[in-house]
Amino acid sequence: MGGLKRMYVIVYGIVQGVGYRRFIQIHAARLGIKGYAKNLPDGSVEILAEGYEEALYKLLDQIKRGPPLSKVEKVDVKFDDYTGEFASFDTY
């Protein structure tokens, strides 16, 4: 397994009002990932996630897929150094 990393993601498309953040929260918890998913005013969702690199890539697969009612059109991803600032994965 790779080392600990931070992943910052902005997801565009039909991702608000369709259970998207909860979907990501469930998958993050299963993968042992900490951080948050937050709705942004422009209709996109911001995700900040920390965990093992392999787990983050598995979460990224779910981020791109989304729940059944969502339609992910674009995903911007940036990796950075792990900070350890989160104790859980929350939604806002």
From Swiss-Prot:
Keywords: Hydrolase. Its EC number is 3.6.1.7. Gene3D superfamilies: 3.30.70.100. The active site is at R21, N39. It catalyses: an acyl phosphate + H2O = a carboxylate + phosphate + H(+). It comes from the Archaea. Residues 6-92 form the Acylphosphatase-like domain. InterPro entries: Acylphosphatase (IPR020456), Acylphosphatase-like_dom (IPR001792), Acylphosphatase-like_dom_sf (IPR036046), Acylphosphatase_CS (IPR017968). GO terms for molecular function: acylphosphatase activity. NCBIfam families: PRK14440.1. Belongs to the acylphosphatase family. PANTHER family: ACYLPHOSPHATASE. This is Acylphosphatase. It comes from Sulfolobus acidocaldarius (strain ATCC 33909 / DSM 639 / JCM 8929 / NBRC 15157 / NCIMB 11770).
